[in-house]
């Protein structure tokens, strides 16, 4: 798919994690023209302009499921369509596992597609210790893939380096969100003097493929920083899926003036052999506004199977034999009789 690099691009953050990430992205110079935010909790809007928000309200105080959140969001469909507007490309960014992100991400992506936009889901997957959220995350990831032209999967566990013993849970989430922003912003960077941006077409050419696109990050400040960062990114990718199954990739290098052309060439030339996918189609971008610590962000696509298959055991067992796998919509108990069916 070819899209004008100056096409109208929107990003929609959903739920706590999605809103925090999109809010931080909005402060950077990216290939995104406008930003919107959707949540069931008005506390999520504390760092954003309220005119860009859509609040999904529930008249009853009840723990919501993803299906209930979608049911409540039906009344806001027109406002979501307004948020999409005339965008040619819409990035739908949400944390998977909670009711809001899991429920709304596939729904918002389907609305964007209905509006004629290219919907690209960005799914933030839960930490390993958040085992109770895995089922919601797995089901929502699959439905987001069905509702979008492509899905980028961001794994919180992969984003995190070693943390100290006194790290709080809030600090852990904050650090993961900032790491996601750093990686995503390097890939969505606008062209500027002295740097080589990827551009929208190259990004979409990688993401809009069968299966899933996986994000892997690594950094190094050693004398062999390019080789070390590449190795680290491939190792991280291998924790999510079989690297040999990758068909396309974009790699973004963020460093300073010490990053040499031979080092950039080494990463691009060796990525195929490092993943074991010799026919890998590689695009790349370079940003020299970073530090001597090289950050490498890798997007690899074409994965039909990932570690997240185990998050949705029913789909794994039944496969294509699932009889009814459409998105379900529900309402909190007591509201069903208040809502017309037409």
Model-derived segments and their meaning:
Residues 1-342:
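Tubulin/FtsZ superfamily GTPase core signature
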């Amino acid at each position: 798919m070819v899209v004008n690099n100056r096409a109208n691009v929107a990003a929609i953050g959903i739920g706590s994690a999605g809103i925090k990430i999109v809010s931080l992205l909005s402060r950077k110079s990216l290939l995104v023209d406008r930003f919107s935010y959707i949540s069931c909790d008005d506390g999520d809007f504390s760092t954003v302009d309220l005119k860009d928000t859509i609040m999904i309200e529930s008249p009853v105080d009840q723990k919501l499921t993803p299906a209930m959140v979608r049911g409540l969001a039906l009344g806001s469909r027109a406002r979501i369509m307004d948020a999409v507007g005339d965008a040619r490309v819409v990035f739908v960014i949400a944390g998977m596992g909670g009711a809001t992100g899991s429920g709304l991400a596939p729904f918002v992506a389907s609305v964007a597609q209905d509006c004629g936009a290219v919907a690209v889901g960005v799914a933030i997957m839960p930490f390993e210790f958040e085992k109770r959220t895995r089922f919601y995350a797995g089901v929502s990831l699959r439905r987001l893939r069905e509702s979008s032209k492509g899905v980028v999967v961001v794994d919180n566990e992969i984003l995190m380096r070693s943390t100290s013993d006194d790290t709080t849970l809030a600090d852990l989430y904050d650090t993961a969100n900032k790491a996601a922003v750093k990686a995503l912003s390097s890939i969505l960077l606008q062209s500027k003097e002295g740097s080589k941006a990827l551009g929208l077409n190259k990004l979409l050419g990688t993401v809009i493929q069968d299966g899933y696109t996986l994000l892997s990050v690594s950094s190094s400040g050693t004398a062999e920083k390019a080789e070390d960062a590449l190795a680290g990114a491939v190792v991280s990718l291998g924790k999510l899926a079989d690297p040999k199954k990758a068909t396309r990739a974009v790699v973004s290098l963020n460093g300073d003036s010490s990053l040499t052309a031979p080092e950039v060439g080494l990463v691009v030339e060796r990525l195929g052999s490092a993943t074991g996918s010799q026919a890998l189609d590689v695009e790349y971008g370079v940003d020299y506004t970073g530090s001597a610590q090289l950050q490498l962000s890798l997007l690899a696509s074409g994965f039909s199977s990932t570690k997240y298959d185990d998050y949705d055991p029913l789909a794994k067992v039944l496969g294509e034999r699932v009889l009814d796998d459409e998105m379900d919509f529900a309402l909190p108990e007591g509201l069903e009789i208040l809502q017309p069916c037409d």
